Design a protein with these regions (language model features):
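Short, basic amphipathic alpha-helical segments that act as recognition/interaction helices
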Residues: 37-65, 106-139
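Short, highly charged
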Residues: 14-54
Length: 152
């Protein structure tokens, strides 16, 4: 019998997947000499890319265009890697997954494809690594200010 999950028992991160090329790019940021003190991990890096992709309507349009015109051309059997993401950014992925552009009669893309596209679109921006690390710090500050600090 299924039991209701208590909100207090929810994990702060959710596991998803990212296609291998974008995962490798995130790994490069993780290993970057610019990622220090604190050294941000994959949930931070992926969440920053998602936050950037959904930051405003222009970025959201860029994300959807990328999914429809670029990601759709890739081999759907492309290797993926597991990657955690913070819950608030996973909610953004879920909202996009349920969006009208991804609903009948349109083609349906999986959450991992949308997460991958968030990384790909972030990667295309002008100083991409610095932009992602700035967003990581903004997300970290927001998490800490809402009582979700690492000390809780």
């Amino acid at each position: 019998m299924a039991t209701r999950i208590d909100c207090d028992e929810r994990r702060p991160t959710v596991q998803t997947r990212v296609w291998i090329d974008e995962h490798d790019w995130l790994h490069g940021i993780f290993k970057s000499p610019h990622n220090t003190s604190p050294k941000f991990r994959f949930p931070d890096l992926l969440s920053a890319c998602v936050s950037l992709a959904f930051r405003d309507s222009a970025n959201q349009a860029r994300l959807i265009t990328y999914v429809l015109t670029q990601l759709s051309l890739r081999d759907p059997k492309t290797e993926r890697r597991s990657c955690d993401i913070w819950a608030p950014q996973f909610e953004l992925l879920l909202d996009a997954h349920r969006g009208p552009w991804n609903s009948f009669p349109n083609s349906k893309f999986d959450i991992d494809a949308i997460a991958t596209a968030c990384v790909a679109v972030s990667r295309l921006s002008g100083d991409a690594v610095a932009s992602v690390l700035r967003q990581v710090r903004a997300n970290f500050r927001a998490r800490c200010s809402t009582g979700n600090s690492p000390l809780n």
